[in-house]
Amino acid sequence: MGVIQAIDRLMTNPIPDGQVDDILRPQGESPLLQKGYVTTSVDALLNWARTGSMWPMTFGLACCAVEMMHAGAARLDLDRYGIVFRPSPRQSDVMIVAGTLVNKMAPALRKVYDQMPDPKWVISMGSCANGGGYYHYSYSVVRGCDRIVPVDVYVPGCPPTAEALVYGILQLQKKIWRTKTIAG
C-alpha cells in the first residue's frame, strides 16, 4: 500500500455500524438534555461573563450624579468589579438613572433605553429617581423612572452614598447570576 492510500485511509471517517451513542443522541433521548445539564452550564457561563463585565451608561440628572462619579473614583474603584462607564447606550448594558426625572426628559430616557442592546438592566439611584423624591408633588416631575423604563434595582437615599450605589451594583450582579437565559 502506498503512502497516499495510507493517508487517505487515516483521513476518512469510519462508517458507524449502528446508532451512534453520542452525548446528545440525536436519534434517541438524551438524559443530559432532559435534566437540563447542558443548558444550565451555558447559562452559568453567560451569567459569569455578564456579571464580570457590566458597562453602565450614566444618566445623571441631578445631585445623585455626583455620588455616581464618586463611586467610579479611586476610593471605591468600580474597575475592580469589571465595571467601565460607557458614554454611548449602544455600548452599555446597564443604565443608572440618577436624579429627578422631569416630564420633558422622560421621552429622552426611553429613547436611550431603547437604543441599548439586550440584555439590559436599569438601576434607579436616589429618592427622586425612585419615586419623585422631594419634588413628588410637582406637576412637572415623573413619580419614579419605573413608569418609563423597567427598573431592576432601587438604590434609596437623598442622595445615596457611593457605597450604596456599589451595593446596588453588587445586588444587580447577583440578580444577573440567578437569571436563566436559555433553560428558562
From Swiss-Prot:
One of its GO terms (biological process) is electron transport coupled proton transport. It is a peripheral membrane protein. It is found in: Cell inner membrane. One of its GO terms (molecular function) is quinone binding. [4Fe-4S] cluster binds at residues 63-64, 128, 158. Gene3D superfamilies: 3.40.50.12280. The keyword Transport applies. It is an enzyme of class 7 (translocase). Its cofactor is [4Fe-4S] cluster. Binds 1 [4Fe-4S] cluster. It catalyses: a quinone + NADH + 5 H(+)(in) = a quinol + NAD(+) + 4 H(+)(out). It comes from the Bacteria. Belongs to the complex I 20 kDa subunit family. This is NADH-quinone oxidoreductase subunit B.
